């Protein structure tokens, strides 16, 4: 309904989809079997949910932070999302896709360039914080 109202996929396509699309393009370029879209989006959702929590935890200030943090409270915590994915038999680590650590870091760092939409990954890039959070993301989700 939100996409129909907006007239585009923006309401349902954030950083999680950008990560998925980045990886999709890599798998296609390597002529490898592309993991299911939902699997990649599920993993990207873990990253996004974690980043919103981490930014608020660290008190990162930016224009619109208060509204962003308030809206992000509607997203289930990443641990809860991970348990749900596990119950469904889905992976909760990007390494399950057979990708390297380097590709994981590249995908998370560059996925914001896939489409001209502002996401939590765009925010990290704009604030110069990507390298600060990349080790945490790698530890938790690779």
Please provide the spans of the model-predicted regions.
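Active-site segments that bind and position negatively charged phosphate/pyrophosphate groups
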Residues: 1-84
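C-terminal charged capping/lid subdomain of soluble metabolic enzymes
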Residues: 54-142
């Amino acid at each position: 309904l939100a996409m129909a109202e907006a007239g585009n996929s923006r309401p349902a396509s954030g950083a999680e989809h950008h990560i998925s699309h980045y990886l999709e393009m890599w798998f296609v370029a390597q002529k490898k079997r592309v993991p299911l879209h939902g699997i990649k989006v599920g993993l990207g959702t873990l990253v996004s949910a974690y980043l919103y929590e981490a930014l608020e935890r660290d008190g990162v200030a930016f224009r619109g932070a208060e509204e962003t943090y308030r809206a992000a409270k509607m997203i289930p915590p990443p641990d809860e999302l991970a348990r749900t994915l596990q119950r469904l038999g889905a992976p909760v680590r990007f390494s399950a896709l057979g990708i390297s650590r380097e590709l994981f870091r590249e995908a998370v760092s560059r996925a914001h360039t896939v489409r001209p939409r502002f996401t939590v990954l765009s925010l990290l890039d704009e604030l110069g914080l990507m390298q600060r959070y990349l080790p945490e993301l790698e530890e938790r989700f690779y």
